[in-house]
Amino acid sequence: MVSLLRCQSFKPSSSLICSLALSAAFALSSSAFAEETKPAENKPATPVVSPPKATAQPANKNQVRFTKTGTFDGDSVVKLARKLASKPYVVLKDPLPAGLAKLTYDEYRDIRFNPISSIWRDQGLPFQMQMFHRGFYFQDLIEIAIVEANQATHLAYEPKYFTAGEVITQALPNDDIGYSGFRIHNQLNTNGVYDELMVFQGASYFRALGKGNSYGLSARGLALKTADPEGEEFPIFRAFWVERPSYDSNLIVVHALLDSPSVAGAYRFSVRPGDNTQIDVEATLFPRVELSKVGLAPSTSMFLHSLNGRHDTDDFRPEVHDSDGLLMFNGRGEHLWRPLANPRQLQVSAFSDNSPQGFGLIQRERNYASYQDLEAHYERRPSLWIEPVGNWGQGAVVLTEIPTESEIHDNIVSFWKPRQPIPAGSEYHFAYRMSWGEEPVAKTNSVVVSRTASGRADIAKATPRRLFVVDYHLNGAMPDELPLAKVESSGGVISNVVIARNAANNGYRLAFELEPEDKELIELRAELKFSTPRQVETWLYRWTL
Protein backbone atom coordinates (compact mmCIF):
# COMPACT_ATOMS: atom_id res chain seq x y z
CA MET A 1 0.00 0.00 0.00
CA VAL A 2 1.32 3.39 -0.99
CA SER A 3 -0.18 6.72 -0.09
CA LEU A 4 0.57 10.27 0.91
CA LEU A 5 1.38 10.65 4.59
CA ARG A 6 -0.83 13.13 6.40
CA CYS A 7 1.21 14.96 9.07
CA GLN A 8 0.03 18.52 9.55
CA SER A 9 0.95 20.17 6.23
CA PHE A 10 3.66 17.61 5.51
CA LYS A 11 3.63 15.87 2.14
CA PRO A 12 6.75 13.80 1.52
CA SER A 13 8.77 14.22 -1.62
CA SER A 14 9.13 10.49 -2.00
CA SER A 15 7.33 8.50 -4.66
CA LEU A 16 3.56 8.22 -4.40
CA ILE A 17 3.03 5.01 -6.29
CA CYS A 18 6.32 3.05 -6.61
CA SER A 19 5.52 -0.06 -8.66
CA LEU A 20 1.90 -1.04 -8.11
CA ALA A 21 0.15 -2.59 -11.09
CA LEU A 22 -2.38 -0.18 -12.55
CA SER A 23 -6.02 -1.08 -13.06
CA ALA A 24 -7.82 -0.30 -16.29
CA ALA A 25 -8.96 3.29 -16.62
CA PHE A 26 -12.60 3.21 -17.61
CA ALA A 27 -15.13 6.03 -17.30
CA LEU A 28 -18.73 6.44 -18.47
CA SER A 29 -19.63 9.65 -20.25
CA SER A 30 -22.58 10.95 -22.25
CA SER A 31 -25.00 8.21 -23.31
CA ALA A 32 -22.35 5.65 -24.21
CA PHE A 33 -19.57 3.88 -22.35
CA ALA A 34 -16.07 5.21 -22.71
CA GLU A 35 -13.64 2.85 -24.35
CA GLU A 36 -11.68 0.85 -21.82
CA THR A 37 -8.09 2.05 -21.70
CA LYS A 38 -4.92 1.29 -19.81
CA PRO A 39 -2.82 3.97 -18.08
CA ALA A 40 0.01 5.14 -20.27
CA GLU A 41 2.94 2.77 -20.44
CA ASN A 42 6.44 3.86 -19.62
CA LYS A 43 7.45 3.88 -23.29
CA PRO A 44 5.98 6.93 -25.04
CA ALA A 45 4.81 6.84 -28.64
CA THR A 46 7.40 9.46 -29.59
CA PRO A 47 10.86 9.99 -28.15
CA VAL A 48 10.88 12.13 -25.03
CA VAL A 49 13.93 14.04 -23.89
CA SER A 50 15.03 13.01 -20.41
CA PRO A 51 15.43 15.70 -17.77
CA PRO A 52 18.91 17.20 -17.69
CA LYS A 53 21.05 15.49 -15.11
CA ALA A 54 20.66 17.35 -11.85
CA THR A 55 23.71 19.03 -10.44
CA ALA A 56 24.28 19.42 -6.73
CA GLN A 57 24.70 22.83 -5.14
CA PRO A 58 27.75 22.99 -2.84
CA ALA A 59 26.76 22.60 0.79
CA ASN A 60 27.89 25.99 2.03
CA LYS A 61 26.35 28.85 3.96
CA ASN A 62 22.75 29.54 3.00
CA GLN A 63 22.32 32.38 0.54
CA VAL A 64 19.46 34.41 -0.88
CA ARG A 65 18.91 33.09 -4.38
CA PHE A 66 15.49 34.32 -5.48
CA THR A 67 13.92 36.83 -3.06
CA LYS A 68 16.63 39.44 -3.16
CA THR A 69 15.57 42.91 -2.07
CA GLY A 70 14.79 45.09 -5.08
CA THR A 71 12.19 46.11 -7.65
CA PHE A 72 9.26 43.73 -8.13
CA ASP A 73 6.37 43.67 -10.59
CA GLY A 74 3.81 41.20 -11.93
CA ASP A 75 6.31 39.76 -14.41
CA SER A 76 9.24 39.30 -12.02
CA VAL A 77 8.51 35.68 -11.08
CA VAL A 78 7.75 34.78 -14.70
CA LYS A 79 11.20 36.05 -15.69
CA LEU A 80 12.81 34.08 -12.87
CA ALA A 81 11.01 30.88 -13.88
CA ARG A 82 11.95 31.33 -17.53
CA LYS A 83 15.61 31.81 -16.58
CA LEU A 84 15.51 28.86 -14.18
CA ALA A 85 14.08 26.53 -16.85
CA SER A 86 16.80 27.48 -19.33
CA LYS A 87 19.38 25.78 -17.13
CA PRO A 88 19.72 22.20 -15.84
CA TYR A 89 17.85 21.45 -12.65
CA VAL A 90 19.95 22.03 -9.53
CA VAL A 91 19.50 20.10 -6.29
CA LEU A 92 19.80 22.86 -3.73
CA LYS A 93 21.73 22.10 -0.56
CA ASP A 94 20.92 24.31 2.39
CA PRO A 95 22.24 22.48 5.45
CA LEU A 96 20.53 22.78 8.79
CA PRO A 97 22.39 22.56 12.08
CA ALA A 98 22.57 18.88 12.98
CA GLY A 99 20.18 19.26 15.88
CA LEU A 100 17.42 20.74 13.71
CA ALA A 101 17.93 18.25 10.90
CA LYS A 102 17.28 15.36 13.28
CA LEU A 103 14.30 16.71 15.18
CA THR A 104 11.59 14.27 16.17
CA TYR A 105 7.95 15.07 15.49
CA ASP A 106 7.36 16.18 19.09
CA GLU A 107 10.48 18.35 19.07
CA TYR A 108 9.53 20.01 15.81
CA ARG A 109 5.99 20.63 17.02
CA ASP A 110 7.47 22.35 20.08
CA ILE A 111 8.92 25.15 17.91
CA ARG A 112 6.06 27.60 17.50
CA PHE A 113 5.79 30.97 15.84
CA ASN A 114 5.19 33.71 18.39
CA PRO A 115 1.92 35.46 17.40
CA ILE A 116 3.32 38.74 18.74
CA SER A 117 5.78 38.64 15.83
CA SER A 118 3.11 38.15 13.14
CA ILE A 119 3.80 40.16 10.01
CA TRP A 120 1.56 43.30 9.86
CA ARG A 121 0.24 42.62 13.39
CA ASP A 122 0.82 46.20 14.52
CA GLN A 123 -0.54 47.78 11.31
CA GLY A 124 -4.24 46.94 11.66
CA LEU A 125 -4.41 45.19 8.28
CA PRO A 126 -7.06 42.56 7.42
CA PHE A 127 -4.37 39.87 7.09
CA GLN A 128 -1.41 38.67 9.15
CA MET A 129 1.32 36.17 8.30
CA GLN A 130 3.32 33.66 10.33
CA MET A 131 6.22 31.49 9.19
CA PHE A 132 7.07 27.83 9.77
CA HIS A 133 10.47 26.74 11.10
CA ARG A 134 12.66 24.30 9.22
CA GLY A 135 13.29 20.85 10.68
CA PHE A 136 11.88 17.33 10.98
CA TYR A 137 10.53 16.43 7.51
CA PHE A 138 10.60 20.07 6.38
CA GLN A 139 14.27 20.29 5.42
CA ASP A 140 13.99 22.48 2.30
CA LEU A 141 14.80 26.17 2.62
CA ILE A 142 11.91 28.28 1.35
CA GLU A 143 12.60 31.94 0.65
CA ILE A 144 9.98 34.60 1.42
CA ALA A 145 9.79 38.28 0.50
CA ILE A 146 7.31 41.01 1.38
CA VAL A 147 6.23 43.25 -1.52
CA GLU A 148 5.13 46.85 -1.00
CA ALA A 149 4.98 49.68 -3.55
CA ASN A 150 6.73 47.51 -6.19
CA GLN A 151 9.62 46.79 -3.84
CA ALA A 152 10.43 43.28 -2.62
CA THR A 153 12.17 42.93 0.75
CA HIS A 154 13.73 39.61 1.69
CA LEU A 155 12.29 38.24 4.92
CA ALA A 156 15.29 36.93 6.81
CA TYR A 157 15.03 34.24 9.46
CA GLU A 158 14.95 35.57 13.01
CA PRO A 159 15.07 33.22 16.03
CA LYS A 160 13.09 35.82 18.00
CA TYR A 161 10.05 35.03 15.84
CA PHE A 162 9.79 31.59 17.47
CA THR A 163 9.33 30.09 20.90
CA ALA A 164 10.79 26.73 21.87
CA GLY A 165 9.08 24.63 24.50
CA GLU A 166 10.52 22.28 27.08
CA VAL A 167 11.14 19.50 24.55
CA ILE A 168 13.73 21.59 22.69
CA THR A 169 17.06 21.56 24.56
CA GLN A 170 19.13 23.53 22.04
CA ALA A 171 19.16 27.21 21.17
CA LEU A 172 17.68 28.24 17.84
CA PRO A 173 20.32 29.38 15.29
CA ASN A 174 21.15 33.02 14.60
CA ASP A 175 22.06 32.50 10.93
CA ASP A 176 19.50 33.11 8.17
CA ILE A 177 18.41 29.49 7.69
CA GLY A 178 15.20 30.48 5.91
CA TYR A 179 11.77 29.00 6.53
CA SER A 180 9.83 25.89 5.51
CA GLY A 181 6.62 27.73 4.64
CA PHE A 182 4.08 30.16 6.02
CA ARG A 183 0.43 30.64 6.86
CA ILE A 184 -1.95 33.53 6.37
CA HIS A 185 -4.41 34.62 9.06
CA ASN A 186 -7.61 36.59 8.65
CA GLN A 187 -10.70 37.53 10.67
CA LEU A 188 -12.48 34.74 8.84
CA ASN A 189 -14.90 33.63 11.54
CA THR A 190 -14.96 36.34 14.23
CA ASN A 191 -14.18 40.05 14.13
CA GLY A 192 -11.00 40.76 16.03
CA VAL A 193 -9.80 37.14 15.95
CA TYR A 194 -7.19 36.25 13.32
CA ASP A 195 -7.86 32.62 12.40
CA GLU A 196 -5.83 30.54 9.99
CA LEU A 197 -6.94 31.04 6.40
CA MET A 198 -4.30 29.40 4.24
CA VAL A 199 -1.06 27.40 4.55
CA PHE A 200 1.84 26.88 2.13
CA GLN A 201 4.22 24.15 3.36
CA GLY A 202 5.77 21.03 1.85
CA ALA A 203 6.65 20.66 -1.87
CA SER A 204 3.95 22.59 -3.78
CA TYR A 205 1.15 21.79 -1.31
CA PHE A 206 -1.23 24.36 0.10
CA ARG A 207 -4.56 24.37 1.94
CA ALA A 208 -7.27 26.92 2.59
CA LEU A 209 -10.45 27.30 4.62
CA GLY A 210 -13.89 28.75 4.18
CA LYS A 211 -15.84 30.16 7.09
CA GLY A 212 -16.42 27.55 9.82
CA ASN A 213 -14.18 24.94 8.17
CA SER A 214 -11.42 22.76 9.60
CA TYR A 215 -8.43 21.73 7.48
CA GLY A 216 -9.07 18.73 5.26
CA LEU A 217 -8.02 18.20 1.66
CA SER A 218 -5.01 19.90 0.06
CA ALA A 219 -4.14 21.35 -3.31
CA ARG A 220 -0.86 21.35 -5.20
CA GLY A 221 0.76 23.64 -7.71
CA LEU A 222 1.33 20.81 -10.19
CA ALA A 223 1.14 17.01 -10.39
CA LEU A 224 3.74 15.08 -12.37
CA LYS A 225 3.73 11.34 -13.11
CA THR A 226 0.98 10.51 -10.62
CA ALA A 227 0.31 6.75 -10.49
CA ASP A 228 3.40 6.16 -12.62
CA PRO A 229 5.23 2.87 -11.96
CA GLU A 230 8.54 4.74 -12.02
CA GLY A 231 7.42 7.03 -9.23
CA GLU A 232 5.87 10.46 -8.88
CA GLU A 233 7.78 13.72 -9.26
CA PHE A 234 6.98 16.37 -6.67
CA PRO A 235 7.67 19.97 -7.74
CA ILE A 236 8.46 22.45 -4.98
CA PHE A 237 7.62 26.10 -4.41
CA ARG A 238 11.12 27.43 -3.78
CA ALA A 239 10.22 31.04 -3.08
CA PHE A 240 7.23 33.26 -2.29
CA TRP A 241 6.54 36.95 -2.65
CA VAL A 242 3.61 38.13 -0.51
CA GLU A 243 2.07 41.49 -1.34
CA ARG A 244 1.22 43.73 1.59
CA PRO A 245 -2.60 43.93 1.67
CA SER A 246 -4.54 47.19 1.70
CA TYR A 247 -6.40 48.37 4.80
CA ASP A 248 -9.81 48.27 3.10
CA SER A 249 -9.35 45.21 0.89
CA ASN A 250 -10.47 41.60 1.27
CA LEU A 251 -7.64 40.48 -1.00
CA ILE A 252 -4.12 39.22 -0.46
CA VAL A 253 -1.83 38.22 -3.34
CA VAL A 254 0.92 35.58 -3.19
CA HIS A 255 3.45 34.91 -5.95
CA ALA A 256 5.37 31.62 -6.04
CA LEU A 257 8.29 30.14 -7.97
CA LEU A 258 7.94 26.44 -8.76
CA ASP A 259 10.82 24.13 -9.66
CA SER A 260 11.43 20.44 -10.35
CA PRO A 261 13.65 18.34 -12.62
CA SER A 262 11.06 18.53 -15.44
CA VAL A 263 9.67 22.06 -15.21
CA ALA A 264 9.88 25.52 -13.67
CA GLY A 265 6.85 27.74 -13.20
CA ALA A 266 5.48 31.07 -12.00
CA TYR A 267 2.26 31.22 -9.96
CA ARG A 268 0.05 34.05 -8.76
CA PHE A 269 -2.58 33.39 -6.07
CA SER A 270 -5.24 36.05 -5.46
CA VAL A 271 -6.94 35.06 -2.19
CA ARG A 272 -10.35 36.37 -1.06
CA PRO A 273 -11.62 34.88 2.23
CA GLY A 274 -15.31 34.30 2.91
CA ASP A 275 -17.99 31.66 3.40
CA ASN A 276 -16.32 30.10 0.38
CA THR A 277 -12.75 31.34 0.14
CA GLN A 278 -11.88 32.06 -3.48
CA ILE A 279 -8.37 31.78 -4.88
CA ASP A 280 -7.71 32.88 -8.45
CA VAL A 281 -4.66 31.05 -9.79
CA GLU A 282 -2.61 32.21 -12.77
CA ALA A 283 0.30 29.99 -13.79
CA THR A 284 2.95 29.84 -16.49
CA LEU A 285 4.97 26.65 -16.94
CA PHE A 286 8.39 26.40 -18.57
CA PRO A 287 9.02 22.67 -19.23
CA ARG A 288 12.62 21.46 -19.36
CA VAL A 289 11.32 18.26 -20.98
CA GLU A 290 8.07 17.25 -22.65
CA LEU A 291 5.33 16.93 -20.02
CA SER A 292 3.19 13.97 -21.07
CA LYS A 293 2.08 12.96 -17.56
CA VAL A 294 1.08 16.31 -16.12
CA GLY A 295 -1.87 17.20 -13.89
CA LEU A 296 -3.22 20.75 -13.69
CA ALA A 297 -5.10 22.06 -10.62
CA PRO A 298 -4.42 18.89 -8.58
CA SER A 299 -6.23 18.16 -5.32
CA THR A 300 -5.34 15.53 -2.71
CA SER A 301 -7.79 14.11 -0.18
CA MET A 302 -8.59 11.15 2.07
CA PHE A 303 -11.35 8.56 1.85
CA LEU A 304 -11.31 5.64 4.27
CA HIS A 305 -14.87 4.32 4.31
CA SER A 306 -18.55 5.24 4.04
CA LEU A 307 -21.91 3.54 3.54
CA ASN A 308 -21.08 2.56 -0.02
CA GLY A 309 -17.99 0.51 0.79
CA ARG A 310 -16.66 -0.23 4.26
CA HIS A 311 -14.64 -3.31 3.24
CA ASP A 312 -15.18 -4.95 6.64
CA THR A 313 -13.80 -1.89 8.45
CA ASP A 314 -13.98 -2.37 12.21
CA ASP A 315 -14.69 1.26 13.14
CA PHE A 316 -17.27 2.79 15.48
CA ARG A 317 -17.60 5.73 13.07
CA PRO A 318 -20.06 5.21 10.18
CA GLU A 319 -17.99 7.30 7.75
CA VAL A 320 -14.41 8.59 7.68
CA HIS A 321 -13.36 10.88 4.83
CA ASP A 322 -12.27 14.41 3.91
CA SER A 323 -14.19 14.17 0.63
CA ASP A 324 -16.92 11.77 -0.47
CA GLY A 325 -17.24 12.42 -4.19
CA LEU A 326 -15.83 13.87 -7.39
CA LEU A 327 -18.20 16.39 -9.01
CA MET A 328 -17.77 17.36 -12.66
CA PHE A 329 -19.54 19.84 -14.94
CA ASN A 330 -18.35 18.82 -18.39
CA GLY A 331 -18.29 20.70 -21.67
CA ARG A 332 -21.47 18.95 -22.88
CA GLY A 333 -23.51 20.41 -20.03
CA GLU A 334 -23.64 17.20 -17.98
CA HIS A 335 -23.30 17.25 -14.20
CA LEU A 336 -21.54 14.06 -13.09
CA TRP A 337 -21.22 12.71 -9.55
CA ARG A 338 -18.72 9.94 -8.86
CA PRO A 339 -18.68 8.64 -5.24
CA LEU A 340 -15.16 7.98 -3.95
CA ALA A 341 -13.95 4.56 -2.87
CA ASN A 342 -11.15 2.95 -0.90
CA PRO A 343 -10.35 0.13 -3.34
CA ARG A 344 -8.46 -3.07 -2.67
CA GLN A 345 -6.18 -2.28 -5.62
CA LEU A 346 -5.01 1.00 -7.10
CA GLN A 347 -7.66 2.48 -9.39
CA VAL A 348 -7.18 5.21 -12.01
CA SER A 349 -10.21 6.66 -13.82
CA ALA A 350 -10.13 9.17 -16.67
CA PHE A 351 -13.25 11.18 -17.58
CA SER A 352 -12.66 12.52 -21.10
CA ASP A 353 -13.92 16.02 -21.81
CA ASN A 354 -13.57 19.08 -24.01
CA SER A 355 -13.60 22.50 -22.36
CA PRO A 356 -14.51 21.43 -18.81
CA GLN A 357 -16.69 23.86 -16.86
CA GLY A 358 -15.65 22.70 -13.40
CA PHE A 359 -14.59 19.77 -11.23
CA GLY A 360 -13.62 19.12 -7.65
CA LEU A 361 -13.45 16.87 -4.63
CA ILE A 362 -16.57 17.53 -2.56
CA GLN A 363 -17.50 16.79 1.05
CA ARG A 364 -21.27 16.53 0.56
CA GLU A 365 -22.26 14.82 3.84
CA ARG A 366 -22.50 17.61 6.46
CA ASN A 367 -24.25 15.78 9.30
CA TYR A 368 -22.20 15.05 12.43
CA ALA A 369 -24.22 11.87 13.00
CA SER A 370 -22.70 10.41 9.82
CA TYR A 371 -19.19 10.63 11.30
CA GLN A 372 -19.52 10.54 15.11
CA ASP A 373 -15.99 11.90 15.55
CA LEU A 374 -15.67 14.49 18.32
CA GLU A 375 -12.07 15.33 17.40
CA ALA A 376 -11.80 15.13 13.62
CA HIS A 377 -15.22 16.67 12.81
CA TYR A 378 -15.18 15.50 9.21
CA GLU A 379 -18.47 17.31 8.65
CA ARG A 380 -16.50 20.58 8.80
CA ARG A 381 -13.94 19.70 6.13
CA PRO A 382 -14.04 22.02 3.10
CA SER A 383 -14.91 21.03 -0.43
CA LEU A 384 -12.72 22.32 -3.26
CA TRP A 385 -14.26 23.36 -6.57
CA ILE A 386 -12.09 24.16 -9.61
CA GLU A 387 -13.40 26.43 -12.37
CA PRO A 388 -11.14 26.69 -15.44
CA VAL A 389 -10.66 30.20 -16.80
CA GLY A 390 -10.78 30.14 -20.59
CA ASN A 391 -10.99 27.05 -22.77
CA TRP A 392 -8.82 24.22 -21.48
CA GLY A 393 -9.47 22.20 -24.64
CA GLN A 394 -9.43 18.43 -24.83
CA GLY A 395 -8.25 16.22 -22.01
CA ALA A 396 -9.61 14.35 -19.01
CA VAL A 397 -10.38 14.75 -15.35
CA VAL A 398 -8.25 12.02 -13.78
CA LEU A 399 -9.17 10.40 -10.47
CA THR A 400 -6.68 8.20 -8.61
CA GLU A 401 -7.89 6.06 -5.68
CA ILE A 402 -5.22 4.34 -3.59
CA PRO A 403 -5.87 1.57 -1.05
CA THR A 404 -5.36 2.65 2.55
CA GLU A 405 -6.04 1.19 5.99
CA SER A 406 -5.67 4.44 7.92
CA GLU A 407 -7.09 7.95 7.84
CA ILE A 408 -3.60 9.43 8.31
CA HIS A 409 -2.93 8.79 4.62
CA ASP A 410 -4.16 10.88 1.71
CA ASN A 411 -5.26 8.34 -0.88
CA ILE A 412 -7.33 10.37 -3.35
CA VAL A 413 -5.92 12.55 -6.15
CA SER A 414 -7.76 14.46 -8.87
CA PHE A 415 -6.55 16.82 -11.60
CA TRP A 416 -7.00 17.87 -15.22
CA LYS A 417 -4.73 16.13 -17.75
CA PRO A 418 -4.41 17.89 -21.13
CA ARG A 419 -4.77 15.57 -24.10
CA GLN A 420 -1.64 16.89 -25.79
CA PRO A 421 1.73 16.84 -24.03
CA ILE A 422 3.26 20.21 -23.16
CA PRO A 423 6.40 20.56 -25.32
CA ALA A 424 9.84 21.11 -23.86
CA GLY A 425 11.02 24.68 -24.19
CA SER A 426 7.49 26.07 -24.50
CA GLU A 427 5.61 28.53 -22.29
CA TYR A 428 2.28 27.13 -21.13
CA HIS A 429 -0.18 29.50 -19.46
CA PHE A 430 -3.35 28.44 -17.66
CA ALA A 431 -5.68 29.92 -15.05
CA TYR A 432 -8.47 28.74 -12.78
CA ARG A 433 -10.54 29.72 -9.76
CA MET A 434 -10.59 27.66 -6.59
CA SER A 435 -13.50 27.79 -4.14
CA TRP A 436 -12.89 26.32 -0.67
CA GLY A 437 -15.89 25.92 1.61
CA GLU A 438 -18.96 24.01 2.69
CA GLU A 439 -21.01 24.88 -0.42
CA PRO A 440 -18.53 25.99 -3.11
CA VAL A 441 -20.90 25.17 -5.99
CA ALA A 442 -23.90 27.47 -6.39
CA LYS A 443 -27.24 25.77 -5.73
CA THR A 444 -29.71 25.69 -8.62
CA ASN A 445 -33.12 24.14 -9.23
CA SER A 446 -31.41 20.82 -9.79
CA VAL A 447 -31.46 17.22 -8.60
CA VAL A 448 -28.24 16.11 -6.90
CA VAL A 449 -27.03 12.82 -5.46
CA SER A 450 -27.09 13.05 -1.68
CA ARG A 451 -26.20 9.51 -0.64
CA THR A 452 -24.85 6.27 -2.07
CA ALA A 453 -25.02 2.96 -0.22
CA SER A 454 -24.48 -0.64 -1.23
CA GLY A 455 -24.66 -4.06 0.32
CA ARG A 456 -25.46 -7.72 -0.21
CA ALA A 457 -28.64 -8.10 -2.27
CA ASP A 458 -29.96 -11.06 -0.25
CA ILE A 459 -29.83 -10.59 3.51
CA ALA A 460 -30.90 -14.21 4.12
CA LYS A 461 -27.95 -15.91 2.44
CA ALA A 462 -24.60 -15.16 0.86
CA THR A 463 -24.77 -13.99 -2.74
CA PRO A 464 -22.49 -12.16 -5.18
CA ARG A 465 -25.40 -9.92 -6.17
CA ARG A 466 -25.07 -6.34 -4.94
CA LEU A 467 -27.85 -3.95 -3.97
CA PHE A 468 -27.24 -0.26 -4.71
CA VAL A 469 -29.31 2.55 -3.18
CA VAL A 470 -28.85 6.07 -4.53
CA ASP A 471 -30.68 8.98 -2.89
CA TYR A 472 -31.32 12.21 -4.78
CA HIS A 473 -32.14 15.60 -3.26
CA LEU A 474 -34.24 18.12 -5.17
CA ASN A 475 -33.45 21.82 -4.77
CA GLY A 476 -36.91 23.30 -5.24
CA ALA A 477 -40.48 22.02 -5.54
CA MET A 478 -40.99 18.35 -6.35
CA PRO A 479 -42.93 17.68 -9.59
CA ASP A 480 -46.04 15.51 -9.53
CA GLU A 481 -44.70 12.79 -11.80
CA LEU A 482 -41.92 10.35 -10.98
CA PRO A 483 -38.86 10.50 -13.21
CA LEU A 484 -37.83 7.55 -15.32
CA ALA A 485 -34.71 5.76 -14.11
CA LYS A 486 -32.11 4.47 -16.54
CA VAL A 487 -29.28 2.27 -15.22
CA GLU A 488 -26.47 0.98 -17.43
CA SER A 489 -23.40 -1.13 -16.80
CA SER A 490 -20.26 -2.12 -18.68
CA GLY A 491 -20.74 -5.74 -17.61
CA GLY A 492 -22.80 -8.05 -15.45
CA VAL A 493 -26.61 -7.89 -15.28
CA ILE A 494 -28.76 -5.05 -13.90
CA SER A 495 -32.16 -6.00 -12.41
CA ASN A 496 -34.95 -4.82 -10.10
CA VAL A 497 -34.63 -1.12 -10.91
CA VAL A 498 -37.00 0.87 -8.66
CA ILE A 499 -37.51 4.63 -8.30
CA ALA A 500 -39.60 6.09 -5.46
CA ARG A 501 -40.21 9.42 -3.76
CA ASN A 502 -38.20 10.07 -0.61
CA ALA A 503 -40.08 12.62 1.50
CA ALA A 504 -37.37 12.58 4.17
CA ASN A 505 -34.92 13.87 1.59
CA ASN A 506 -37.23 16.01 -0.56
CA GLY A 507 -36.19 13.85 -3.45
CA TYR A 508 -36.05 10.32 -4.74
CA ARG A 509 -34.53 6.94 -4.00
CA LEU A 510 -33.19 4.75 -6.78
CA ALA A 511 -32.51 1.09 -6.02
CA PHE A 512 -31.21 -1.66 -8.29
CA GLU A 513 -29.28 -4.92 -8.15
CA LEU A 514 -26.11 -5.91 -9.94
CA GLU A 515 -25.12 -9.49 -10.76
CA PRO A 516 -21.37 -9.25 -11.49
CA GLU A 517 -21.18 -12.71 -13.13
CA ASP A 518 -17.48 -13.25 -13.86
CA LYS A 519 -16.46 -9.59 -13.94
CA GLU A 520 -13.90 -8.08 -11.56
CA LEU A 521 -14.54 -4.45 -12.54
CA ILE A 522 -17.82 -2.91 -13.70
CA GLU A 523 -18.64 0.71 -14.51
CA LEU A 524 -22.16 1.81 -13.55
CA ARG A 525 -24.16 4.79 -14.74
CA ALA A 526 -27.59 5.96 -13.56
CA GLU A 527 -29.76 8.79 -14.89
CA LEU A 528 -33.14 10.22 -13.95
CA LYS A 529 -35.27 11.49 -16.84
CA PHE A 530 -37.98 14.12 -16.27
CA SER A 531 -40.75 15.14 -18.68
CA THR A 532 -39.68 18.78 -18.36
CA PRO A 533 -36.08 19.97 -18.72
CA ARG A 534 -34.24 19.84 -15.41
CA GLN A 535 -30.57 19.68 -14.44
CA VAL A 536 -30.00 16.25 -12.92
CA GLU A 537 -26.72 14.81 -11.76
CA THR A 538 -25.64 11.64 -13.52
CA TRP A 539 -24.43 9.04 -11.02
CA LEU A 540 -21.25 7.16 -11.92
CA TYR A 541 -19.72 4.32 -9.95
CA ARG A 542 -16.91 1.79 -10.33
CA TRP A 543 -17.63 -1.58 -8.74
CA THR A 544 -14.64 -3.84 -8.09
CA LEU A 545 -14.10 -7.12 -6.30
UniProtKB/Swiss-Prot annotation:
Gene3D superfamilies: 2.70.98.10, Immunoglobulins. Keywords: Periplasm, Signal. Pathway: Glycan metabolism; osmoregulated periplasmic glucan (OPG) biosynthesis. Residues 38-60 are annotated as: Disordered. The keyword Transferase does not apply. It comes from the Bacteria. Residues 1-34 form the signal peptide. It is found in: Periplasm. Pfam families: MdoG (PF04349). GO terms for molecular function: carbohydrate binding; catalytic activity. GO terms for cellular component: outer membrane-bounded periplasmic space. The keyword Phosphoprotein does not apply. One of its GO terms (biological process) is beta-glucan biosynthetic process. Belongs to the OpgD/OpgG family. Involved in the biosynthesis of osmoregulated periplasmic glucans (OPGs). This is Glucans biosynthesis protein G.
